[in-house]
Design a protein with these regions (language model features):
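A general structural signal for well-ordered alpha-helical segments in protein cores
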Residues: 13, 40, 76, 80, ...
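N-terminal Rossmann-like dinucleotide-binding module
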Residues: 1-46
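Acidic-histidine catalytic/liganding microenvironments
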Residues: 23-24, 61-62, 126
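Short, Asp-centered acidic motifs that coordinate Mg2+ and/or phosphate
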Residues: 31, 66, 116
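General small-molecule cofactor/ligand-binding pocket signal
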Residues: 30, 50-52, 118
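Alpha-helical structural signal in soluble globular domains
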Residues: 19-23, 43-46, 82-86, 105-109, ...
Length: 136
C-alpha cells in the first residue's frame, strides 16, 4: 500500500481528504500535517489517521511514500523541494510555483532525483469539459 501524507487541511485539503481517504486499497492517508494553530486539531480524535504539526518530522518518516500538498502557493517551492530531497513523491495543487524559474528548478530537481511530481488541475466538471465529454 502507498502511504501518503496530506499537508494542508483548509477547504481544498479537506475536500481531497474526503474524496480519497478510504477509497482505495492501494493508497491511504497515513498522516495529515496541520499547522499548530489549526482549528482542525479539534477533529483529531475522530480520525484514524496520524496527525502531526511538523512538516519535517513527516518527511523523516520512512513509512510515508508520497506527499499531497494542499497548501498556499507561497510555500510550494520550499515544500516540494524538501519532499523531493526526502525521497517522497509529490502531488501539489496548482500552481506548482510562483515563477517560471522556480517551476523549472522544481521539475529539474524532481527529474534528477527520479521522483514522481504531479500538479493538480482538475476541471472535469467544468461546463466546457462536461460538454466535450458528452459529445465524444
Amino acid at each position: 500500500m502507498v502511504k501518503l501524507a496530506l499537508v494542508g487541511f483548509g477547504r481544498w485539503g479537506r475536500r481531497l481528504f474526503a474524496a480519497l481517504d478510504g477509497t482505495s486499497e492501494k493508497t491511504s492517508f497515513a498522516t495529515v500535517v496541520l499547522r499548530p494553530d489549526s482549528v482542525a486539531l479539534g477533529l483529531v480524535p475522530r480520525w484514524k489517521t496520524q496527525v502531526v504539526t511538523d512538516y519535517r518530522s513527516m518527511l523523516d518518516d520512512p513509512s510515508i511514500d508520497g506527499v499531497v500538498l494542499a497548501t498556499p502557493p507561497s510555500g510550494h517551492k520550499h515544500e516540494v523541494l524538501a519532499a523531493i530531497q526526502a525521497g517522497k513523491h509529490v502531488y501539489v495543487e496548482k500552481p506548482l510555483a510562483l515563477t517560471l524559474a522556480e517551476a523549472e528548478e522544481i521539475v529539474a530537481v524532481s527529474s534528477k532525483a527520479k521522483i514522481i511530481l504531479a500538479v493538480g488541475f482538475n476541471r472535469r466538471f467544468a461546463p466546457a469539459f462536461a460538454e466535450m465529454k458528452k459529445r465524444l
